[in-house]
Amino acid sequence: MASSASDGTHERSAFRLSPPVLSGAMGPFMHTGLYVAQSWRDYLGQQPDKLPIARPTIALAAQAFRDEIVLLGLKARRPVSNHRVFERISQEVAAGLEFYGNRGWLEKPSGFFAQPPPLTEVAVRKVKDRRRSFYRIFFDSGFTPHPGEPGSQRWLSYTANNREYALLLRHPEPRPWLVCVHGTEMGRAPLDLAVFRAWKLHDELGLNIVMPVLPMHGPRGQGLPKGAVFPGEDVLDDVHGTAQAVWDIRRLLSWIRSQEEESLIGLNGLSLGGYIASLVASLEEGLACAILGVPVADLIELLGRHCGLRHKDPRRHTVKMAEPIGRMISPLSLTPLVPMPGRFIYAGIADRLVHPREQVTRLWEHWGKPEIVWYPGGHTGFFQSRPVRRFVQAALEQSGLLDAPRTQRDRSA
């Protein structure tokens, strides 16, 4: 087992989101260099009782550099707002601390996540491309924030979130189901189908595949005001986005169970989707497995790490103040309900977006140290990683999702 490199202070003061052109262009090079230097220090100084550190290589540095480019793009979509906007965010965070604290949810977060009603009305539409066909499903989310919850009116103004969308690859006979939860900036059919290798899971491994779209992504991101993103700097938007994502997937699970009561169901989440899947797996009983890929453990903490604010910037106080809210919506504050043999995690040792130690390792330990694979790559390197592909298939086999008898299947679903 290996882990990533740097816990150095330079990472906690990441480059600013709106740098001059030169420093912005040089940022990925500079941070990759710092990563490699710290990696060598960690590699040469590792202790036997610590997680092993991968030997730095050119290939690993290239993976880290690619992550830095991705991070630069994410930050361009999420520039830090001025002090006036942060004053409003700070006021909402203070109101949120009072609201959640008065209800005991900061201490017992499970009460924050409302139990959704079963999903009964679903529209299904068949879609054909050049070689295959699949289904798009639609249903009304029905989610609303708690009465009086800070930021609720703004969240409800994002009306594209009212409708949930999902892709469905389904066999004519009953088969196990795998719910694949995408990451940030995904939620588009061609991308999601490719990243999850959905057709292989469906055609070769015989699974029914459902791929829900998270709030403010894909078709649910239409008509948003400028700067509105999930996840982003608006802490209460992150809270509502997390709550609605969990709500929608739990409703989708109820529909799957109504379709095939005896079929096994598993979760397969990636990055932000791994975070959401870990929450669902801590609230829903009866799941056969939860496979968490490069998962976030504490969303607010992660955003604070990458916010780019200097140590003395007063806006950093808002980030610090929001930490209890981040813990409230973190799987680290909940108990996983998936049986231990059904818990799986994979992560990249050179991940520059989701820190292997600060995020992944903490979640792995909280989940009881289930089976984990550390692949030699960055956050985006999982897609080309053969160890990850083998690990996911082995996880599905171990969970029983591939044990059901297989017959000749219709490739067109």
UniProtKB/Swiss-Prot annotation:
Induction: A member of the dormancy regulon. Induced in response to reduced oxygen tension (hypoxia) and low levels of nitric oxide (NO). It comes from the Bacteria. This is Uncharacterized protein MT2702. The lineage of its organism: Bacteria, Bacillati, Actinomycetota, Actinomycetes, Mycobacteriales.
